[in-house]
């Protein structure tokens, strides 16, 4: 079995590993993965490690209103109270197109997942029901992962990366932090949003369709995961579920990567990181890539192909399974 080296779970704690690569010119690239759910101290430790190093960081920028919402709504309840009416208002005009899209393009495995979710719906609480409904109404947009992650955080007494790190009043003012990610606010400036949505729902390219289906499967799987957490009363067992689930999923994804299977959800964002690495190593000798752990296998392969070799690693505890404060 292929080993995914960016995560470790010893049965007691879940760790993320920062792998440091160096080339013949002594330029170092620190591949510093981040788990979006963890202890507050975990995120403090990561920031302390980065310090003044040049840092490539991820954060999908949605519309300005969405960004403000994410920074102001610190709990799941606050988030859903604000965002759900907005989803209803914007996506109501596309409900007929969405139904046709689901009927025409859903594959056998997606339909199977939909049936599995429906079977679990009797266990839904109000939050899961709202998140599930919002997914359906909004075409299973990637922004729906955020409330799912908030639900898991609150069910395990853990923090979310976007709450633990101030991406509004702190990070944008750090001159050594370089935002390298999708920016839908800029992309939508010169695009007719209605035309774009209609095109994606009626005549998507094969690449876009595969991306959307992967996204839908990911969200449906996570909805089932929320139900499993709800049915598991002990916080320690929930944390164990998350830790073992992450290890299994990312190891499986890494095996697919080594077999050159494409992953369209991550590919575009990874290519942005790769271009930024090539740009920065021209003028800097110490660079951190601070990105979600799911991206790191592909980025590591790219760095190795650029002539870098492994030098050392640093370990960060994301959370303990049994926590006295949980």
Language-model-detected regions and their locations in the chain:
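Structured, acidic catalytic/metal-binding patches in enzyme active sites
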Residues: 1-264, 312-323
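C-terminal soluble interaction/assembly domains
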Residues: 274, 278, 289-291, 298-301, ...
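A short acidic, amphipathic alpha-helical/loop segment
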Residues: 41-49, 276-280, 299-302
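Extended hydrophobic/aromatic segments used for targeting, binding, or gating
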Residues: 285, 300, 305-306, 310-326
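Beta-strand elements within well-structured catalytic alpha/beta cores of enzymes
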Residues: 32, 286-291
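Alpha-helix capping/helix-boundary segments
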Residues: 62, 295-296
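A short, acidic, amphipathic alpha-helical segment used as a generic capping/interface helix at domain edges
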Residues: 265-285
